[in-house]
Amino acid sequence: MAKNIVVIGTQWGDEGKGKLVDLLTEHANAVVRFQGGHNAGHTLVIDGRKTVLHLIPSGILRDSVTCLIGNGVVLSPEALMQEIGVLESVGLSIRDRLIVSEACALILPVHIALDNAREAARGGKAIGTTGRGIGPAYEDKVARRGLRAGDLRDTAGLPERLRELLDYHNFMLTRYYGAQGVDFQETLDSLLDLGGKICPMLGDVAGILHRYQSAGENVLFEGAQGAMLDIDHGTYPYVTSSNTTAGGASCGTGVGLLNFDYVLGITKAYATRVGNGPFPTELLDATGEILTQKGAEFGATTGRRRRCGWFDAVLMRRSAKLNGLSGICLTKLDVLDGLPRIGICTGYRYDGQEIDTVPIGADNYARCEPIIEEMPGWQESTAGIRALDDLPANARAYIRRLEETTGVNVDIISTGPDRQDTIVIQNPFAAG
């Protein structure tokens, strides 16, 4: 029987989704991205070789898997072709296995210019975007003035639509932000060139997924960023511009909600956040520095240093409800090796009261102080362990406590960056 499995990040992104998608595609016929853009950075390590993907689904490293980019993704034609070029340079076949939705909103150079101009204008109140034009492209999509991937086929009508869009945005860039405008002819020439390469890969992704469902094919839906960066449910305004929760898999691909069978939440054994925004369990001491350095907590897309802190069970309970999690994949357990004590946030102090929920809004959330429960650490190495019983006793106790405090079973444990450094307790494709 066909299984549709959704993989999402449960925290603030960078949880290790790429590795798990790559691992699970052994059982999948297709992998589809459903939101975000090339602001994502999914790092895969296979047989010691590191690959970082930003836009193309993580299943691309398996020759038998079809990869799709759904309508919920904002697509940079330039970034897509650059990524294809990098993968083809190491001998991978890409273009015959990649299908891009005609309904994808396009990211243009003017969106990048707007993104950077806005962040500069915000100064100390900057959101901390990746500067890739994601937000402005989503704005144009919602305002119904943006270009879509299918428009690349209409070479006759493209110039007029592009000029209208650039006139609108260049007015804002030059008159309001005092920045340089974006050149029309240069943008048009680039789009026509890139369009000729991308158009053969365009297709009706929703229709293809419907056919897969009818044919009994397994499909993996790959989320980007994390649930607490969701435009509606995250720590607004320090969020991304798309729905990063599991519900985004439906509207971002055209697959109905009742067709999803399992939602796997990828969760670090501690917490990280990149950019600005409230982070109650953040560690600004030597332990935080250990997590940063040992966990190599630097962004795959921007190289920015990630802030590190203890696991937040309050946030995870919220995330579990928002996403309807079926199970958790716990990643980077090995980063905690050697710590004498490990903390878990089980509640917050908020305006003098103890609460066990996440307040709405960044200003309210910033007033929360974590209530930390400490557990003994372990000195043994967990790196590369592939059987649950081989983990140190204190590591197993830590995992059990995470299950108790979040209310969700840990079905998979990642003990290292390589595809095989994994303990699979319950395979989502085999779940009843």
From Swiss-Prot:
Keywords recorded for this protein, A-Z: Cytoplasm, GTP-binding, Ligase, Magnesium, Metal-binding, Nucleotide-binding, Purine biosynthesis
Q: Which PANTHER family match?
A: ADENYLOSUCCINATE SYNTHETASE (PTHR11846:SF0)
Cofactor(s) recorded in Swiss-Prot or TrEMBL: Mg(2+)
Subunit structure, as described in the record: Homodimer.
The kind of enzyme this is, by top-level EC class, is: ligase
Note on how the cofactor is bound:
Binds 1 Mg(2+) ion per subunit.
List, alphabetically, the Gene3D superfamilies matched: Adenylosuccinate Synthetase, subunit A, domain 1, Adenylosuccinate Synthetase, subunit A, domain 2, Adenylosuccinate Synthetase, subunit A, domain 3
Q: What is this protein called?
A: Adenylosuccinate synthetase
- The catalytic site is made up of 14 (proton acceptor), 42 (proton donor)
List residues binding Mg(2+): 14, 41
Binding residues for substrate? 300-306
One annotated GO molecular function = GTP binding
Q: HAMAP family recorded for this chain?
A: Adenylosucc_synth (MF_00011)
Q: Which residues bind IMP?
A: 14-17, 39-42, 130, 144, 225, 240, 304
Positions that bind GTP: 13-19, 41-43, 306, 332-334, 414-416
Under Enzyme Commission nomenclature, its number is 6.3.4.4
- Which organism does this record belong to? Methylococcus capsulatus (strain ATCC 33009 / NCIMB 11132 / Bath)
**In its keyword annotation, does this UniProt entry include Transferase?**
no
Family per record: Belongs to the adenylosuccinate synthetase family.
